[in-house]
Amino acid sequence: AVTCTVVTKALGPCMTYLKGTGATPPPANCCAGVRSLKAAAQTVADRRMACNCMKSAAQKTKSLNYKVAARLASQCGVRMSYSVSPNVNCNSVQ
């Protein structure tokens, strides 16, 4: 099951990137975390949990660049059914 600890650990290497301009590709260890998170979130419940964890972490992170955050998965070549934004409705995630 996906927990907020799993999400935080997976996305930890992305934090510096997510506070920047997104002018350079995300670091390899950040994309590895994104891929592991996608692999871990196999069920709708897992994906909703991951979404809620990312949303609350994003709200607590000062100077997070939401434009960069929204593109993170695609920059890493990963298809996600939702993006990180302050008003994403995690209950609608399939």
Curated annotation (Swiss-Prot):
InterPro entries registered for this protein in UniProt: Bifun_inhib/LTP/seed_sf (IPR036312), Bifunc_inhib/LTP/seed_store (IPR016140), Plant_nsLTP (IPR000528)
Alphabetical list of SUPFAM superfamilies matching this protein: Bifunctional inhibitor/lipid-transfer protein/seed storage 2S albumin
Superkingdom in the source lineage: Eukaryota
GO process terms (BP): lipid transport
Transmembrane segments: none
Record's keyword terms, sorted: Disulfide bond, Lipid-binding, Transport
Cysteines engaged in disulfide bonds, as pairs: 4-53, 14-30, 31-76, 51-90
GO molecular function, one term: lipid binding
PROSITE patterns: PLANT_LTP
Record function comment: Plant non-specific lipid-transfer proteins transfer phospholipids as well as galactolipids across membranes. May play a role in wax or cutin deposition in the cell walls of expanding epidermal cells and certain secretory tissues.
Protein family: Belongs to the plant LTP family.
Protein name from the UniProt record: Non-specific lipid-transfer protein
